[in-house]
């Protein structure tokens, strides 16, 4: 966010044009999205990440009607229509619980990388319940479980199920009679333990693209393309 977002955006743009073998002058239109979009002055248009995720999800799979986005800062449940337009959306409260940041903190508490945490969460045997979704209290629970010599894989599975319960409850509050096909976007979609737990809670299969964390960026690019065609 802030100046950091502006610097990151400029660096990302430089890397992108270099990789594509073009110059900045070749770019006709730029659309910014995400939390830091308000701080980026180089864009022609600024569109919310909710609208961009819906656009990107529809492009990748036109049958999707519910998008679950779990990023570093928040969780979103988005209902979209047959054209990819947003019908309704809900976000978690300002607490970090269940977000990518929450998982990073739990991984650090367990002395693991996020990749290790994702793999180990699939190897669980005992169904441990993490009762608190508050980051501070959940961390305390994890420390207590480690002291009780509980298997780390079981603790991770408990965390995964807690996250899935929170996300599932958010999706249910959308109040859709027919939620259609589900897509999960955001970096947390790379965590197989989370996706398995969420599929169990939703009672449905999640469509996950190869680079789920770029779905919003894809949507922004599609909006830029449409603007160019209209010009």
Task: Annotate each PLM feature.
Residues 138-173, 213:
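Adenine-nucleotide phosphate-binding core of ATP-dependent small-molecule kinases
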Residues 1-49, 199-209, 231:
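N-terminal glycine/serine-rich phosphate-binding loop of ATP-dependent small-molecule kinases
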Residues 35-88, 172, 219-229:
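Conserved phosphate-binding catalytic cores of ATP/NTP-utilizing and phosphoryl-transfer enzymes
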Residues 1, 45-54, 68-72, 90-98, ...:
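Active-site nucleophile and cofactor-binding loops and adjacent substrate-binding regions
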Residues 26-34, 71-82, 133-140, 188-203:
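Acidic-glycine-rich active-site phosphate/pyrophosphate-binding loop
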Residues 35, 175-201, 212-216:
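Glycine-rich phosphate-binding loops at beta-strand->alpha-helix junctions
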Residues 1-2, 82-126, 222, 226:
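Glycine-rich phosphate-binding loop plus the immediately following alpha-helix
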